[in-house]
């Protein structure tokens, strides 16, 4: 049931290892790259809760989650074929929007799929298997341009403004693998029917399990909070414009205002007798389980760190360890290829560590296991500024890989044990908000931090990311795992 993640992660690995390279090749400046990357988090912010809500209510001959697997796979594969042929930065950015939207359509139901199909006792192992496939696919996906250059003699350089052939062919192969892997999952697994799901989850007796059967909210409170958020967002927007702050901050100001409008709309719709759709999504978001709220803070700081790596890994490694920022130079492209190797190492480590996580969780707890993973990852990121020899950076990547394994396994195993099965999809989608919000914050602020705090030295963004991950580890200590596999 997790085999489709091979395809999903091929898409992510190619994107994470090569997108900044593509943007720089097409003429984007370093401090503009975070804003171009904003497609990934915004797509997830919008699409995952909607797809989760819809898939919770879908049942046809393909099943509940599978129709979304198929749609997302077709669109993502097409985007992978088109993206490396982008003639300009803005075409590449548009393809990134399409790719990320499509990946989210596939990925969100696939996480809920594991929650649907496995018992509490099996969920840590189930998400660990997903982590293995994610790591294994990322190793090959990240290495593809390097393999094509060094094994098949496909050039990794091109004329100014053109994408190297090795990168193009890597994306073509990735598109084929994406659709093939997802189709394998679709045709080799059988989903449980709604009736079977009900029978499997008769143990749910707490309030959360019955939440939504009779939705009730206080419109006055929603009107009040909605107005506060709307006004705060508008004031923030005015300040950004008046003081000519970085335009990426509009992402934050608009987001605050729009969420306020959603609160107002939910209150209005509820008064008219509508309790589904937007009303239910906003209600569920405002009334999420306590454990989910605790995990949200951990996830915010963890993904801020990971997004620092995704955005600045190429510029940090090429400038600090290979001594150049010129995308046309051989040293730059060698450094960019080495970043692909580094990405493959941390994903490879994650794939191997995934097998140890269920054992560690049984010996200690899921919370303790994840705390250890985050501390090791934070120190690994910070060490990128200490090691000068590029080969020693693989040690740093081993640490990051351990954190990556925990990040992809433990929060989802804990979450799927504390949310009602009828809302597995929508809550998995909502949890993604706490993955993408830090990415939006990063995209809105990292360009400012790079120039104002670090004088353009992107290696320091790796240190900042490491500090953020250590903070996440401290916050994880306070998470209460309410699942039956908690101990």
Residue ranges and their predicted role:
Residues 1-43, 236-237, 294-298, 302-327:
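Helix-loop boundary and gating motifs at the non-cytosolic
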Residues 30-31, 120-130, 336, 419-431:
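Loop-to-transmembrane helix entry/capping segments in MFS-fold secondary transporters
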Residues 46-62, 352-366, 450:
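Helix-to-loop junctions at the C-terminal end of transmembrane segments
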Residues 69-88, 376-388:
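C-terminal ends and interior cores of transmembrane alpha-helices
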Residues 79-83, 87-106, 392-406:
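Hydrophobic core of transmembrane alpha-helices in multi-pass small-molecule transporters
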Residues 87-90, 106, 120-307, 475-487:
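Intracellular loop-helix junctions on the cytosolic face of multi-pass helical membrane proteins
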Residues 105-118, 406-420:
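Intracellular juxtamembrane helix-capping segments at the cytosolic ends
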Residues 361, 367-410:
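C-terminal transmembrane helical hairpin of 12-TM major facilitator-type secondary transporters
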């Amino acid at each position: 049931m997790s085999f489709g993640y091979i395809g999903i992660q091929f898409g992510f690995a190619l994107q994470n290892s090569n997108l900044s390279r593509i943007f720089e090749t097409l003429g984007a400046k370093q401090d503009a790259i975070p804003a171009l990357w904003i497609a990934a988090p915004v797509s997830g912010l919008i699409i995952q809760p909607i797809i989760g809500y819809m898939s919770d209510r879908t049942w046809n001959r393909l099943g509940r989650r599978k129709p979304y697997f198929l749609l997302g796979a077709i669109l993502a594969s097409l985007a992978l074929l088109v993206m490396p042929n982008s003639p300009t930065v803005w075409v590449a950015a548009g393809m990134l929007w399409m790719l990320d939207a499509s990946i989210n359509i596939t990925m969100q139901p696939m996480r809920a799929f594991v929650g649907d199909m496995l018992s509490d006792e099996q969920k840590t192992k189930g998400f660990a298997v997903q982590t293995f496939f994610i790591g294994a696919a990322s190793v090959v996906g990240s290495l593809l341009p390097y393999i094509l250059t060094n094994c098949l003699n496909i050039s990794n350089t091109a004329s100014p403004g053109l994408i190297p052939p090795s990168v193009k062919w890597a994306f073509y192969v990735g598109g084929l693998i994406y659709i093939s892997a997802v189709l394998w999952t679709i045709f080799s697994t059988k989903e449980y029917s709604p009736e079977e799901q009900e029978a499997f989850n008769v143990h749910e007796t707490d309030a959360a399990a019955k939440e939504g059967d009779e939705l009730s909210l206080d419109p006055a409170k929603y009107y009040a909070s909605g107005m506060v958020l709307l006004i705060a967002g508008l004031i923030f927007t005015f300040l950004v414009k008046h003081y000519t702050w970085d335009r990426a901050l509009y992402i934050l100001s608009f987001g605050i205002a729009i969420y306020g409008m959603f609160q107002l709309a939910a209150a209005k719709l509820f008064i008219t007798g509508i309790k589904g759709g937007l009303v239910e999504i906003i209600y569920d978001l405002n009334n999420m389980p306590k454990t989910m709220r605790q995990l949200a803070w951990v996830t915010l700081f963890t993904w801020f760190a990971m997004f620092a790596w995704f955005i600045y890994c190429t510029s940090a490694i090429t400038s600090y360890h290979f001594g150049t920022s010129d995308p046309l130079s051989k040293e730059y492209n060698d450094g960019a290829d080495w970043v692909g190797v580094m990405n493959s190492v941390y994903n490879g480590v994650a794939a191997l560590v995934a097998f140890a996580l269920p054992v560690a969780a049984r010996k200690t707890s899921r919370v303790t296991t994840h705390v250890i993973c985050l501390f090791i990852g934070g120190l690994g990121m910070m060490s990128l500024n200490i090691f000068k020899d590029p080969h020693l950076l693989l040690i740093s990547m081993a640490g990051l890989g351990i954190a990556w394994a925990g990040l992809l396994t433990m929060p989802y195993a804990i979450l799927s044990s504390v949310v009602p099965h009828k809302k597995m999809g929508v809550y998995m989608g909502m949890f993604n908000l706490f993955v993408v919000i830090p990415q939006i914050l990063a995209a809105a602020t990292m360009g400012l931090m790079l120039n104002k705090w670090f004088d353009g030295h992107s290696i320091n963004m790796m240190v900042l990311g490491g500090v953020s991950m250590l903070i996440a580890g401290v916050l994880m200590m306070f998470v209460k795992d309410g699942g039956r596999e908690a101990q």
